Regions:
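C-terminal scaffold of the Radical SAM
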Residues: 1-221
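Short amphipathic alpha-helical interaction segments
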Residues: 220-235
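A short, conserved structural fragment
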Residues: 234-244
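Minor-groove-contacting beta-hairpin "wing" of winged helix-turn-helix DNA-binding domains
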Residues: 245-249
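Short, amphipathic alpha-helical interaction segments positioned at domain boundaries
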Residues: 251-264
Length: 264
């Protein structure tokens, strides 16, 4: 999996990345030459100063390389999750970052979707596209409520009701491990409501959706109170019911966060 982010020099500069587009292409070609037949690339859109046309060029260039899996994420900025030494973090702290308006970001998302779909890549999750048989098995654990282990500096893990994160200092991580200790920085136990909210938000990211009635029942939440909103989503073309499953349409996936918040 390659964190390309963009082939455009101006976008990479804004993100504080040290590579350029040609370097990313050469890295992809090197992976192919080494025998890798499953290469994934990640991209970011919604960057300050970025245009819809630049996003289109990125998507077309990525599709032309023939990658089996492509991810495209809208940029979100969280000062707490950005390392202090990252240029973007310093700019954010100084109030120098202005992201594109929401309607432009949605237009970027739709351009990516259309370009990838024309190239034979299926949108199987809000931000992820793949050729048949190449869906991300790792990320599916996040979207379907599975467990995963935190291995490495700053990694996060989830086992049952517990969520935990490792220390973000490599030096401290090594000290803890060599002392036979778990290098955890924090741990919390999620309530049934928190797990329900997470399950709904993550499950609706998938193009296949989720069984909302069963999810409500599993976590003690009333489905009937949500039924009118579900019916409204279907009537407005933002979702469809397939048996017991509720899945969002392309238009619904574009506003996934707002829909999930209402259902929670």
């Amino acid at each position: 999996s390659m964190g390309v982010q963009s082939f455009e020099a101006s976008t990479l500069t804004k993100l504080g990345r040290g590579h350029d587009g040609d370097t990313a292409v050469r890295a992809f070609e090197a992976a192919r030459a080494a025998g890798f037949d499953n290469v994934s690339m990640d991209f970011i859109y919604g960057v300050q100063g970025q245009t819809v046309e630049q996003v289109r060029r990125d998507a077309e260039a990525a599709a032309a390389l023939g990658s089996e899996h492509l991810s495209a994420y809208a940029l979100t900025l969280d000062a707490e999750s950005l390392a202090e030494e990252v240029p973007l973090a310093r700019q954010l702290a100084r109030g120098e970052v202005t992201l594109p308006p929401d309607d432009v970001v949605v237009a970027m998302q739709r351009v990516v979707r259309d370009v990838y779909r024309q190239a034979g890549l299926e949108r199987y999750e809000v931000s992820n596209y793949a050729r048949p048989g190449f869906h991300s098995r790792h990320n599916s654990a996040y979207w379907t409520g599975g467990d995963w282990l935190a291995l490495g500096v700053g990694a996060t893990g989830s086992v049952g009701q517990a969520r935990y994160a490792n220390v973000r200092s490599a030096e401290k991580y090594l000290v803890e491990v060599e002392a036979g200790k778990l290098p955890e920085q924090s741990r919390e136990t999620l309530s049934a409501l928190e797990r329900f909210e997470e399950r709904v938000a993550m499950g609706l990211r998938l193009a296949s959706g989720l069984d909302l009635e069963a999810t409500c029942a599993a976590f003690g939440q009333p489905f009937d109170a949500r039924r009118p909103f579900v019916e409204r989503l279907v009537a407005e073309g933002l979702a469809v019911r397939e048996g017991r499953r509720l899945r969002l349409t392309d238009e619904g996936l574009d506003v996934h966060s707002a829909i999930s918040a209402r259902l929670m």
